[in-house]
């Protein structure tokens, strides 16, 4: 039997994961300028995202420019774009499928496949979380590698942006939501319920003797025993 509370918690986490993934995908702060070494005093700070890069001047003015070409971007940026878009689409599909399979909805209430639909929604959430976690972790690894590398100039080093933190949290929310939805349905509990219903059906339909009327088998035995001794 599906746990309604576990499904509700999983669905809310899935929605939060989807919202955070979309915001992290659009934010231009995956990488921010690092103020170390000779770059401590600088008039312009840069931040880069998947779709645009921004320059923040010392006067407080921020200018953002969308990338003029997508094919000219590095391969890791293109892969991150594709994975984040696919993750958002997968999580959106998971939200729709999970609504159909949740116990608190009116869809397929008498169908045995309702719990299976919820499990499918949970699998979509897990796939969406994995697709969102891979590009975030890859960019995080690249930032840390370049930051601690002595071969990279200080002016070319970046720090972790807010979008990466949001992406990690959102992907974890999607993964936890998928696990909750998958484990909220117990196949053993469903089999036992159907078995009990099947066993109880002939007992409920069995006719009971009327008041004052002896059972049929007992009356036949009594008549046989009386006639046998006459």
From Swiss-Prot:
The record marks 65 as: Paracellular cation selectivity. GO terms for molecular function: identical protein binding; paracellular tight junction channel activity; structural molecule activity. Residues 29-81, 138-162 are extracellular. Residues 1-7, 103-116, 184-230 are cytoplasmic. Residues 205-230 are annotated as: Disordered. It catalyses: Na(+)(in) = Na(+)(out); K(+)(in) = K(+)(out); Rb(+)(in) = Rb(+)(out); Li(+)(in) = Li(+)(out). It is found in: Cell junction, Tight junction; Cell membrane. Residues 229-230 are annotated as: Interaction with TJP1, TJP2 and TJP3. The keyword Phosphoprotein applies. Pfam families: PMP22_Claudin. One of its GO terms (biological process) is paracellular transport. Residues 220-230 have a biased composition (Polar residues). The disulfide bond is necessary for pore formation, but is not required for correct protein trafficking. The chain crosses the membrane at residues 8-28, 82-102, 117-137, 163-183. There is a cross-link at residue 218 (Glycyl lysine isopeptide (Lys-Gly) (interchain with G-Cter in SUMO)). The modification Phosphoserine is found at residues 219, 223. One of its GO terms (cellular component) is tight junction. Keywords: Cell junction, Cell membrane, Disulfide bond, Isopeptide bond, Membrane, Phosphoprotein, Tight junction, Transmembrane, Transmembrane helix, Ubl conjugation. Disulfide bonds join 54-64. InterPro entries: Claudin, Claudin2, Claudin_CS, PMP22/EMP/MP20/Claudin. Can form homo- and heteropolymers with other claudins to mediate paracellular barrier and channel functions of tight junctions in response to physiological stimuli. Homopolymers interact with CLDN3, but not CLDN1, homopolymers. Directly interacts with TJP1/ZO-1, TJP2/ZO-2 and TJP3/ZO-3. Forms paracellular channels: polymerizes in tight junction strands with cation- and water-selective channels through the strands, conveying epithelial permeability in a process known as paracellular tight junction permeability. In intestinal epithelium, allows for sodium and water fluxes from the peritoneal side to the lumen of the intestine to regulate nutrient absorption and clear enteric pathogens as part of mucosal immune response. In kidney, allows passive sodium and calcium reabsorption across proximal tubules from the lumen back to the bloodstream. This is Claudin-2. It comes from Bos taurus (Bovine). The gene is CLDN2.
């Amino acid at each position: 039997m599906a746990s309604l509370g576990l499904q509700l918690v999983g669905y809310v986490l899935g929605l939060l994961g989807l919202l955070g993934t979309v915001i992290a995908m659009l934010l231009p702060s995956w990488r921010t300028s690092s103020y170390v070494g000779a770059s401590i005093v600088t008039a312009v700070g840069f931040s880069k995202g998947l779709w645009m890069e921004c320059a923040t001047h010392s006067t407080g003015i921020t200018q953002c420019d969308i990338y003029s070409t997508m094919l000219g971007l590095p391969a890791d940026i293109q892969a991150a774009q594709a994975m984040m878009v696919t993750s958002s689409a997968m999580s959106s599909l998971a939200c729709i499928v999970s609504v159909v399979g949740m116990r608190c909805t009116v869809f397929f209430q008498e169908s045995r496949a309702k719990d299976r639909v919820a499990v499918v929604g949970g699998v979509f959430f897990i796939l969406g979380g994995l697709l969102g976690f891979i590009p975030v972790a890859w960019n995080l690894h690249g930032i840390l590698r370049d930051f601690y590398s002595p071969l990279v100039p200080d002016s070319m080093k970046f720090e972790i942006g807010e979008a990466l933190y949001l992406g990690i949290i959102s992907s974890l929310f999607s993964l936890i939501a998928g696990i909750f939805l998958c484990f909220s349905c117990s196949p053993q509990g469903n089999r036992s319920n159907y078995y009990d219903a099947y066993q109880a059906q002939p007992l409920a339909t069995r006719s009971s003797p009327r008041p004052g009327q002896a059972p049929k088998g007992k009356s036949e035995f009594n008549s046989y025993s009386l006639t046998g001794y006459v």
